[in-house]
Amino acid sequence: IGVSSALYRCKLTGPKCPSSVIVKLPALDEAAVFTSTMLRMYIREANFFKALINQMPINVPVGFLSEVDEETSRFVVVMEDLGNLRIADQNVGMTIDDARKSIDAVARMHAKWWGEGDALAEEGVTVSLGDPIYPAVLPFVFGEGWAKLTSEMSLPQAILEIGPHFSEALPKLLSSMVVGPNTLCHGDYRADNLLFNENNEPVAIDFQLLGTGTGAYDIAYFVTQSLTPEVASKHERDLFDQWVTALITHGAPAGLVDRDALWLHYRTAALFCLAYPVIA
């Protein structure tokens, strides 16, 4: 299974080994491999398991092997099989209780690297949300998706007013998400990439879009991609405020946490997230 990657469950036998592991390899579809290679997705995930996994303050899978050829992007990750954990159905929408737990978890990660995220991008461990690859690629693919979407579906008037101008606005939206203070961003933090253990604690998976930028991006992405419109409208400000409070609780320097500026970043990122359903 998988879109940007092919995932396999491998059964193991023998002493001192788990009964199964998950093996992640490049996708079977050549177009998906091309896109994933261009966006350095395989390199990012391999680097996560090599450089960051032991520093993560949130639950993530155990990694057993991680290798990548940076010239060809051939890669392999062997990780813990979490198939026994509870999943949240993104099509149904995450419950508010699960959402609150997920917000607190990602706040712990953001707090650990708050104001220090740029170094990760400079070291090649992450890709900045302001990286030139995004404005080079996204306006074109958004334009293609928008043309197809508007020819086949009826859309709300508010979206129809924004869509024709969105590709032109994308570079500015992207640059606004790296004005700082920057931190480590999961990049794909949504219900499909969150499992819940026996204590109902979230376990984050899929680190192929690991990035550096404003942590508000992860929050906006999570809210817009994981909650129903009704739940999001009712709770988004509460979830945002919970995140800001949790940043300081988990160690982000209070002097670098500007609630008003972060709310603006959140709103900008939420607008940017229109790109995902259109491109998909």
Model-predicted regions and their roles:
Residues 1, 13-18, 117, 161, ...:
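Regulatory N- and C-terminal appendages and interdomain linkers associated
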Residues 1-73, 197-202:
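Conserved NTP-binding catalytic cores of kinases and kinase-like/nucleotidyltransferase enzymes
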Residues 3-12, 22, 169-215:
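Active-site acidic catalytic loop and adjacent metal/ATP-binding pocket
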Residues 31-35, 87-92, 204-205, 221-229:
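Glycine- and acidic
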Residues 74-84:
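Conserved short submotifs of the Hanks-type protein kinase catalytic core
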Residues 85-186, 198:
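ATP-dependent phospho-/nucleotidyl transfer catalytic cores
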